[in-house]
Amino acid sequence: MSENRTLMLNGMWNNNPALVQLLGLCPLLAVSSTVTNALGLGIATLLVLVGSNVTVSLVRDYVPKEVRIPVFVMIIASLVTCVQLLMNAYAYGLYLSLGIFIPLIVTNCIIIGRAEAFASKNDVLPAALDGFWMGLGMTSVLVVLGSLREIIGNGTLFDGADLLLGEWAKVLRIEVFHFDSAFLLALLPPGAFIGVGFLIAAKSVIDKQIAARQPKQQKQAIERARVTNV
């Protein structure tokens, strides 16, 4: 199995940062009330993950081990600031909607964890691929959870997509159900907790089904030779 395929499987499924490592739950639960918010924060996190992994991999031989964590945090904070300024300039409505959760990417355990566990020990290309697949895995969970919460809570999908993609994206809005009033449980953090629980349970069921279909390796019985004195 190639290294890229291994990194892809780890980031998207086997070691998914949200469903397996359970990292970054604060923004996952707070921001995923709509697909637009989830996708916006997911893209921002992905960009910071790739940028921080690449930068950490480039400077890993020049940073003393005693101060590596503060240096990594400074790198991540610089990248988050760049992403925040870009979002403020080109997606101001989404910037206001996400609020404090954009700068809080600095404290996201996924980013500092990948910088310390992988990027600081590998070359630039594997580090970039690791950041991309981990970020994409996080983004996919955000989008799936955001879709479920938006459909159940508001009966819509891609509501407010113009905040991220521009005026043309208003045509993407889909009204799945018509509600006289929103279902608040799905839109509030308790609904997000329930949704994450269902996603983790679904992944566990799928993993068990995959494991059951794989041929079991039978261990060869080892017989102990009995030695007797003749």
From Swiss-Prot:
Its EC number is 7.-.-.-. Its main location: membrane. GO terms for biological process: electron transport chain. Coiled coil: none annotated. Keywords: Cell inner membrane, Cell membrane, Electron transport, Membrane, Translocase, Transmembrane, Transmembrane helix, Transport. GO terms for cellular component: plasma membrane. Pfam families: Rnf-Nqr (PF02508). Signal peptide: none annotated. HAMAP family: RsxE_RnfE (MF_00478). NCBIfam families: PRK12405.1 (NF009070), rnfE (TIGR01948). The complex is composed of six subunits: RnfA, RnfB, RnfC, RnfD, RnfE and RnfG. This is Ion-translocating oxidoreductase complex subunit E.
